[in-house]
């Protein structure tokens, strides 16, 4: 059967719950137009009263509202909160429902009603998990695909649609579709789910941001070990790039012995290659880096070296002139 709870605009299909739980259902909880063999509309009202008076009714209602909250945009959540706040207190509602059931002579339902309510709550909890998975993966892909289509259209046409419009139909057709697909009673004509064909609305942006943060957290947790391995590999390569202690000592000894002119000749480099076991390129790179380090650390010595070079160049020039 399909019944409609006025305060929350919830359409519940108990036949689906019965099928999910292996066919266990209350005798009056089948059919779509009323209770099968339950006495028509009066029997249906009695069944509603029995459900509302059941101890698990509040839990069932909470599970159903939780399903609605999963994919509802943030800007639409106050509608659900307002409808819940407008309900009478649970105790008063249960008392009124029990009184109505007693006045109508409705059966209590017994174990079959208890079984139905229990399985329905479990079914809704499972449905909520499926919705969360859908929002986390498929809805995110759909929203991003719409956004990419809008960007492509804008790049091709140069036209920028109005924020939140995304209209691809005439106003009459758009209003007709909105009136048929409203999610809540008293909707103002906007899309209840908030997913426009082109532009992202505020609710969509909130949903995208929430899904993005969840995916970011999951990816970070999933790739944490790989990031640690990569970091260790980088540090290992850095450590491997340093020269051994005895090799560096040999080069530094030569440097200190020739600190006034730390430019080894080709014969010096060949001898250092034999002593250290390094390649000629490594020797050249070490002396280049060592000279840079000493230039920055001892500017006075570098300036004196430059002055010596200038004097030697000047002397060479005078010799050439005299010659």
Curated annotation (Swiss-Prot):
Isoform 2 is expressed in roots, leaf blades, leaf sheaths and flowers. Isoform 4 is expressed in leaf blades and at lower levels in flowers. Residues 158-180, 291-323 are annotated as: Disordered. PROSITE patterns: ELK (PS51213), HOMEOBOX_1 (PS00027), HOMEOBOX_2 (PS50071). Gene3D superfamilies: Homeodomain-like (1.10.10.60). Pfam families: ELK, Homeobox_KN, KNOX1, KNOX2. InterPro entries: ELK_dom, HD, Homeodomain-like_sf, KN_HD, KNOX1, KNOX2, TALE_homeobox. Residues 214-234 form the ELK domain. Residues 235-298 bind DNA. One of its GO terms (cellular component) is nucleus. One of its GO terms (biological process) is regulation of DNA-templated transcription. This is Homeobox protein knotted-1-like 11. It comes from Oryza sativa subsp. japonica. The lineage of its organism: Eukaryota, Viridiplantae, Streptophyta, Embryophyta, Tracheophyta.
């Amino acid at each position: 059967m399909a019944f409609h709870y006025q305060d929350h605009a919830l359409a519940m299909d108990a036949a689906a719950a019965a099928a999910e739980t292996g066919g266990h259902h209350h005798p009056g909880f089948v059919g779509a137009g009323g209770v099968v063999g339950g006495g028509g509309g009066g029997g249906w009202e009695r069944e509603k009263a029995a459900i509302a008076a059941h101890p698990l009714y509040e839990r069932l209602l909470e599970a159903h509202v939780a399903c609605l909250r999963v994919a509802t945009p943030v800007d639409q959540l106050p509608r659900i909160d307002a409808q819940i706040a407008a309900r009478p207190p649970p105790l008063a509602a249960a008392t009124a429902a029990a009184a109505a059931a007693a006045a109508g002579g409705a059966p209590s339902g017994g174990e079959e009603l208890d079984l139905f309510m229990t399985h329905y709550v479990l079914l809704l909890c499972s449905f909520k998990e499926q919705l969360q998975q859908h929002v986390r993966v498929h809805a995110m892909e759909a929203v991003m695909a719409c956004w990419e289509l809008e960007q492509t259209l804008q790049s091709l046409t140069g036209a920028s649609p109005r924020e939140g419009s995304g209209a691809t139909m005439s106003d009459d057709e758009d209003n007709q579709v909105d009136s048929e697909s409203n999610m809540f009673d008293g909707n103002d004509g906007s899309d209840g789910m908030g997913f426009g064909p082109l532009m992202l609305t505020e609710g969509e942006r909130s949903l995208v941001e929430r899904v993005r943060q969840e995916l970011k957290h999951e990816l970070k947790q999933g790739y944490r070990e790989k990031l640690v391995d990569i970091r260790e590999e980088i540090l290992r390569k850095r450590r491997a790039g340093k020269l051994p202690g005895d090799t560096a000592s040999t080069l530094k000894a030569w440097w200190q012995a020739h600190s006034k002119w730390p430019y080894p000749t080709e014969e010096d480099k060949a001898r250092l290659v034999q002593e250290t076991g390094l390649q000629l390129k490594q020797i050249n790179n070490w002396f280049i880096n060592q000279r840079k380090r000493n230039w920055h650390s001892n500017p006075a010595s570098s300036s004196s070296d430059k002055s010596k070079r200038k004097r030697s160049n000047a002397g060479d020039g005078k010799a050439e002139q005299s010659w």
